[in-house]
A protein has these predicted regions:
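Generic structural signal for coil-to-beta-strand starts
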Residues: 38-39, 75
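Short, surface-exposed charged micro-motifs
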Residues: 30-32, 41, 67
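Short solvent-exposed loop/turn micro-motifs enriched in small/polar/acidic residues
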Residues: 2, 24-26, 61
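Short, charged beta-strand/loop "edge" motif centered at a coil->beta-strand transition
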Residues: 6-37, 83, 89
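C-terminal boundary/linker segments immediately following FHA domains
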Residues: 46, 52-99
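Generic beta-strand structural signal
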Residues: 3-5, 35-36, 44, 71
Length: 99
């Protein structure tokens, strides 16, 4: 999935999302990823929270209607922690692309 400058993607169960997931733990519109100031940010918009585990950092961030800057790569848990890597967990990697 590509998110460019001033772009964003919505993640959730609903078909209107750019990234649709099939997990009962995820909300219809669960989270949004967007670019701000050269960083990629994830904003939780769910009922059950979003969890972010960045590779190289043992501490998982729990979001409840909050946002955080994404690290270079890691895991996103939709509605539950990333431990166990079930159908609610997304693996992500950020990379710069030339226009």
């Amino acid at each position: 999935m590509v998110v460019g400058p001033r772009g964003s993607i919505k993640i959730g169960r609903d078909k209107s999302n750019e990234m649709m997931v099939n997990s009962t733990k995820a909300s219809r519109v669960h989270a949004r990823i967007f670019e701000r100031g050269g960083n990629f940010v994830i904003a939780d918009q769910s009922s059950n929270g979003t969890y972010v585990a960045t590779d190289g950092n043992s501490r998982e961030v729990s979001l409840r209607r909050e946002e955080t800057v994404l690290g270079e790569r890691g895991y996103i848990g939709l509605g539950a922690p990333t431990e166990g890597h079930g159908d609610h967990v997304l693996r992500y990697r950020l990379e710069a692309r030339k226009p």
